[in-house]
């Protein structure tokens, strides 16, 4: 027991424990990679069994100290190379590491055996355990030989190995979880395995590669990977601040081969969607899906029929005037008002109004039996759907905070917001192709314009819902006829406008430089 009082013994023990743990970290990473080939229920068992068998093997190697020392004696010579037992172990161990690392890299780069898709094939339990033992033997051989040269007491060496292995057993599961959550770390560690395997093969042929070179390369790579993980964490934190709806829409549109949403970026660790075959999804399908996914983020002002385009019946007019208005209009439903649009009495079908006129019934009395459903302009389109269901085929009047009518919304307006425009008989399309540009009404929904012209993120302010609002915001005031306003890639020329609003514009889209070269 006197040797236990020797400080050099404890210093040697501590040094060996640290050495075994440091040299065992890369071993643990590769054990985690091998265990991932097994079904989830067997991974912990394989990891513990493999490390336990490796511990027994290390203790056995330490017990053969005298024999291991003789491994440096040459056994035979081939050409100018002399091979000892240690050289052969290094050579074949290095070849095994090179083969294993190359195979793993190929499988991961080809995306094999790592997807949770249909029919994932798992490796045999004992095959993986055997590979873990062999891998540990290759990694531990150099450390064991180093330990023999550092300490003269076999019990001290065995104690260091047991302590280090206990630490490895405790750290194996958290490290495995970390490796599985970070695919780039796996590829980095496999590249380390290639370097270590190459150094072992070189040493087997008698070419000594200073360990400092390997440790410097590994350390530098680890620092770069740490920066990569920090950047990825910051990226995920930034993405988490974006609306879940925007991220979901981006993923679905990318899956269908459409353009991604503005401000939504991609994580390099996440695979890009598979190429979409030509014609797999029609442009109309992409348009409608985009409309559905972005419906909740849009304003009622971009969906509704604006105040200036509402056809309404003035109850104060004569019978003949009302009849003429009803017969000349393609609409089947009218708001009945008293003198002005803001004085709404009710919503009545044209057929009922014509019958009332023939029978001499007061139009206002008929309208008062069907009061209008009024919603604020701040209501989002998703909640509007419930209001339209309760309206039972009627439309909904949209007002501002002062009760002034801003427009009306019908079920058809919601459908147009999703599937595109369905103009009435008395309407012209909101967007018309005109040579190398487009004629666009001022009240056109900004989202519809972006879809039709294949542009994104024209307005920074979410309150801007129409083309007129866009040009007024960009210009700072209501522009005059002939003014040209540039918004992103669009050159907008004012065609019709007055002191209060913009009615018609002509838009020319600037083509990207690479398109012009083509």
Curated annotation (Swiss-Prot):
- Keyword Repeat belongs to the record: yes
Q: Where in the cell is it found?
A: Cell inner membrane
Q: What keywords appear on the UniProt entry?
A: CBS domain, Cell inner membrane, Cell membrane, Membrane, Repeat, Transmembrane, Transmembrane helix
The molecular function terms in GO held by this entry are: flavin adenine dinucleotide binding
Q: What is this protein called?
A: UPF0053 inner membrane protein YoaE
Q: Which Gene3D superfamilies match?
A: 3.30.465.10, CBS-domain
Q: Taking the first listed entry, what is the main subcellular location of this protein, grouped into a coarse class?
A: membrane
Return the Pfam families for the record.
CorC_HlyC, TerC
The record ties this protein, via PROSITE patterns, to: CBS (PS51371)
Topology relative to the lipid bilayer, per the entry, is:
Multi-pass membrane protein
Q: Which family does it belong to?
A: Belongs to the UPF0053 family.
Specify the CBS domain's residue ranges: 304-363, 367-427
What are the record's GO terms for cellular component?
Answer: plasma membrane
Cytoplasmic compartment spans: 1-13, 70-78, 146-149, 206, 376-518
Give the Periplasmic compartment stretches of this protein.
Answer: 35-48, 100-124, 171-184, 228-354
Under CDD domains, the record lists: CBS_pair_CorC_HlyC_assoc
């Amino acid at each position: 027991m006197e040797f236990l009082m020797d400080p050099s013994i404890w210093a040697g023990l501590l040094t060996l424990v640290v050495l075994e743990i440091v040299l065992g970290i890369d071993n643990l990473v590769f054990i985690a990679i091998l265990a991932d080939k097994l079904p989830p229920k067997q991974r912990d068992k394989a990891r513990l069994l493999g490390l336990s068998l490796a511990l027994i093997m290390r203790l056995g190697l330490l017990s053969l100290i005298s024999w291991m020392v003789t491994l440096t004696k040459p056994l035979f010579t081939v050409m100018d190379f002399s091979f000892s037992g240690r050289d052969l172990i290094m050579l074949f161990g290095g070849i095994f590491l090179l083969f294993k690392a190359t195979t793993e890299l190929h499988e991961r780069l080809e995306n094999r055996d790592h997807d949770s898709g249909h029919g994932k094939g798992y490796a045999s339990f004992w095959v993986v355990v055997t590979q873990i033992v062999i891998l540990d033997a290759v990694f531990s051989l150099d450390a064991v030989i180093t330990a023999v040269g550092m300490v003269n007491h076999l019990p001290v060496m065995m104690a260091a190995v047991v302590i280090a292995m206990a630490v490895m057993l405790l750290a194996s599961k958290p490290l495995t979880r970390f490796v599985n959550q970070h695919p780039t770390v796996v590829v980095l560690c496999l590249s380390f395995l290639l370097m270590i395997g190459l150094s072992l093969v070189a040493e087997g042929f008698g070419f000594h590669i200073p360990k400092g070179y390997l440790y410097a390369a590994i350390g530098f790579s680890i620092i770069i990977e740490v920066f990569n993980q920090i950047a990825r964490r910051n990226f995920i934190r930034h993405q988490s601040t974006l609306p879940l709806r925007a991220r979901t829409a981006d993923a679905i549109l990318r899956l269908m081969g459409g353009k991604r949403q503005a401000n939504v970026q991609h994580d390099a660790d996440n695979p890009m969607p598979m190429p979409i075959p030509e014609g797999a999804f029609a442009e109309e399908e992409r348009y409608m899906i985009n409309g559905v996914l972005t419906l909740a983020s849009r304003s009622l002002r971009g969906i509704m029929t604006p105040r200036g385009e509402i056809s309404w019946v003035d109850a104060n007019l004569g019978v003949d005037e009302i009849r003429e208005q009803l017969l000349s209009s393609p609409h089947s439903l009218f708001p009945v008002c008293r003198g002005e649009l803001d004085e709404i009495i009710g919503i009545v079908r044209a057929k009922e109004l014509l019958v009332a006129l023939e029978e001499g019934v007061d139009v206002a009395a008929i309208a008062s039996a069907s009061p209008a459903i009024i919603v604020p302009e701040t209501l989002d389109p998703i909640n509007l759907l419930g209001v339209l269901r309760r309206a039972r085929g009627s439309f909904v009047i949209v007002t501002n905070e002062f009760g002034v009518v801003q427009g009306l919304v019908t079920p058809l307006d919601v459908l147009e917001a999703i599937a595109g425009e369905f103009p009435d008989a008395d309407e012209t399309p909101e967007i018309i192709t005109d040579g190398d540009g487009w004629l666009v009404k001022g009240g056109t929904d900004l989202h519809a314009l972006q879809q039709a012209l294949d542009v994104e993120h024209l307005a920074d302010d979410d309150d801007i819902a129409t083309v007129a609002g866009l040009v007024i915001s960009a210009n700072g005031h209501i522009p005059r006829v002939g003014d040209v306003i540039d918004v992103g890639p669009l050159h907008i020329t004012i065609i019709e406008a007055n002191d209060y609003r913009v009615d018609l514009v002509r838009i020319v889209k600037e083509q990207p430089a690479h398109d012009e070269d083509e």
